[in-house]
């Protein structure tokens, strides 16, 4: 399992640990990742993803997983998240003609 957010593609960064005597040694800054279960209203099921805490805030801000994925850039999403996005778009397209007919 890689240390990369499935929604925002945040990954490890490299920097320096600087001692008191100003000696620099390489270190890695790892993203704050959490295993989170989101509820997809369009799909009608729970979706478990490994995302950064920043992504959790973004999903909340956009009004849920479905709304976030509809707005998200496909290049930043993991293959699993991209499959979810396509499935949600497909469900939304199926539901749209029914809403217009009523």
Swiss-Prot record:
GO molecular function: structural constituent of ribosome
Pfam families: Ribosomal_L28
A single cellular component GO annotation: cytosolic large ribosomal subunit
Keywords of this entry: Ribonucleoprotein, Ribosomal protein
Gene3D superfamilies assigned: Ribosomal protein L28/L24 (2.30.170.40)
Disulfides per UniProt: none
Keyword Disulfide bond: no
Domain of life of the native organism: Bacteria
A biological-process GO annotation: translation
UniProt keyword annotation of Ribonucleoprotein present: yes
Region (Disordered), start-end ranges: 1-20
Family: Belongs to the bacterial ribosomal protein bL28 family.
Protein name: Large ribosomal subunit protein bL28
Organism for this UniProt entry: Bradyrhizobium sp. (strain ORS 278)
């Amino acid at each position: 399992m890689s240390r990369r957010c499935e929604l925002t593609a945040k990954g490890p960064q490299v920097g320096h640990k600087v001692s008191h005597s100003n000696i620099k040694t390489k270190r890695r800054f790892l993203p704050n990742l959490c295993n989170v279960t989101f509820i997809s209203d369009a799909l009608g099921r729970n979706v478990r993803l490994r995302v950064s805490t920043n992504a959790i805030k973004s999903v909340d801000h956009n009004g849920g997983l479905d709304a976030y994925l509809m707005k998200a850039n496909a290049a930043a999403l993991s293959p699993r998240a991209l499959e979810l996005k396509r499935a949600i778009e497909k469900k939304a397209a199926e539901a749209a003609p029914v809403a217009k007919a009523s």
